[in-house]
């Protein structure tokens, strides 16, 4: 019976490379010279420090550009509100989102059931498993899942016949 898994994960080496490239460009850019700007990653938490809101916004846009260049979907970043830090700087804490949450999984399942395809979808922790008799139904489900906007990038793995 053909099946596939739906997952959402982050490639940490690629994310770290994008972060390093972003920091290198920040160090070279003229409009950031002499300013204390930092981006740090500890596990799934990214802390950005900038002197003001405008610079913080520029750093976030720059990080997103570098993520796209390294083929990491920028939707993996869940950006929180900014807060005042020591001195006159502003700190923003972001979180890397991995795995498909229960409510997103239920949303995907209801959308697939609306298509009335002969497939079964099961929630397995933070991923989904879809099984069906026809390969065409599974491929149609894959295209429908990519069309659903859940705010996370999804990948299809373990496609088996």
Curated annotation (Swiss-Prot):
Keyword Nucleotide-binding part of the UniProt annotation: yes
GO cellular component: cytosol
CDD domains for this protein: YajQ_like (cd11740)
SUPFAM superfamilies: YajQ-like
Gene3D superfamilies: 3.30.70.860, YajQ-like, domain 2
Any matching Pfam family: DUF520
MF GO annotations: nucleotide binding
Presence of keyword Nucleus: no
Key words of the record: Nucleotide-binding
Stated role: Nucleotide-binding protein.
HAMAP family, per the entry: YajQ
Family listed: Belongs to the YajQ family.
The name this protein goes by in its record: Nucleotide-binding protein SAR11_0692
The organism's taxonomic lineage, starting at the top: Bacteria, Pseudomonadati, Pseudomonadota, Alphaproteobacteria, Candidatus Pelagibacterales
